[in-house]
C-alpha cells in the first residue's frame, strides 16, 4: 500500500488520506474506509436489528470481530449469567454473530477478553489501519500507529453495512514528553498528569500524537495505556508512530503478516511518521523527569494531583465553573481540602480494564505484592484483560502471588471498571482503580474512585491508603 505524496503531513493525516473513499472537500464529511471493526454485546444489538430490518448483510464479516466483555461475570463463568439484562445482551450477541457470520470469542474461549486487549494480542491491530468499535476506548489501538476511534450504535450499523464511515477531518495535537521517567513512574502517570494539565476538554476535536523520548522508551503496553485515556482528555483518538518496539510486538502474532507480506507491510509501516515541518493545530509539552506517581481526587479524570500532594482547596481555584465542580466532587468523594493524598484510606483496589489489564501491568503488581499481604479490611480484585493474559500470568506464577497475598484472581472481563456486571462497589466504598474513569457511580452507585497506576494500586492494597511502592520500604 503506497502512501499518497504530499508535503509535511502528520501521522494522523497520512492514515486518514490513505483511507478516503470519497472526499467531501470540506463541504461534507469524507467517506473513510474501515480496516477493522470490533464489536461487543452492549452497543451492537440495535445495529444488527437495523441490518435485519433493511435486509442487509454484513459487508465484510472477515474484517469484523466480536467478544464478550462488558457484562460478563469474572467468576463462575461456566454458569448462566445471573443478571437478566446482561444475560440477554450476551445471548443476543451470540445469535447475531451466528446469523451474520461474524467471528465471536465467547466466555470460556481462550481468546475471550476485553475487545481492546484481544485485538492487539491477536495481531489484528496493525500500523496504518483505521479501526472502530462501539466503545470510546477504541483509541487504545492508536498505540500501533492506527487511527482508532469509538463510534455510536447508528455508526456501528453503517460500518457493518458498508465497511465505511462518513467523518469530518479532525484537528491535530502533538503531546511531546521528553526526558527520562523517574523510577516508579509509569505510562499511567504520564496520561493522568497530561489530563490534569490540559483538562478533560483540552483535546476536544483533536487526534493526539504522542511524541518524545519518554514515549519512545515505553513498551507497547505503556503506549496502549496512554492512547486509551486520550478520550479522557477529550480527544477523538490518540496515536504513537510505529517503531521497532511496535514491529517486535507484532512479529509472529496470529494475524500478523508473514514472509513477503511482512516485508511489504514493514515497508509501509516505516513510512508512518509525521514529516519534518508538519504543523499541528496544538502542541503540549511535558518534562518526564518532573513527573511522579499521580492519582485523582475528584470525579473526573482531570481532577488529579501527584500522590505526594494534598487534596486541593476549591477556594484557591479562580474559575467559577471549575471551583463549583471541585466543591461538588469533594462532597461526593467525602474529602476535605488539605488532606494528604497518602492518608486517604480505601476499601477496595481494582487492577484491570482495557487501560491496565495486560501482562506487563500484572507483572508490576506481582512484583509489589510478592512477599506481602493485602491490608486487613481491603478487598483487592485482579482481573486480566483477556483469557490469554490470564494464561500467561498463570504460566509465570503470578496468579499464585496474587492469591497468596490475599487478592482475588479473576477471569477476564471489564469487571469493576464500570457498573454493568457483578463486580461493583457498595455505596460509600472507596476504590483505587487502574481503570480510566472516576465518574460518580462509575463503579457502582455511590462508589468513590481514585484512578491510579498498577504500581500505586498494588502498594495501596498493602498499606490500605493511597501509596506508591516506595512507601513500603
UniProtKB/Swiss-Prot annotation:
InterPro entries: 3-IsopropMal_deHydase_lsu, Acnase/IPM_dHydase_lsu_aba_1/3, Acoase/IPM_deHydtase_lsu_aba, Aconitase_4Fe-4S_BS, Aconitase_4Fe-4S_dom, IPM_dehydratase_rel_enz, IPMI_cat. [4Fe-4S] cluster binds at residues 354, 414, 417. Binds 1 [4Fe-4S] cluster per subunit. Pathway: Amino-acid biosynthesis; L-leucine biosynthesis; L-leucine from 3-methyl-2-oxobutanoate: step 2/4. GO terms for biological process: L-leucine biosynthetic process. Its cofactor is [4Fe-4S] cluster. Gene3D superfamilies: Aconitase, domain 3 (3.30.499.10). It is an enzyme of class 4 (lyase). It catalyses: (2R,3S)-3-isopropylmalate = (2S)-2-isopropylmalate. It comes from the Bacteria. Transmembrane segments: none annotated. Heterodimer of LeuC and LeuD. PANTHER family: 3-ISOPROPYLMALATE DEHYDRATASE, HOMOACONITASE, MITOCHONDRIAL-RELATED. This is 3-isopropylmalate dehydratase large subunit. The lineage of its organism: Bacteria, Bacillati, Actinomycetota, Actinomycetes, Mycobacteriales.
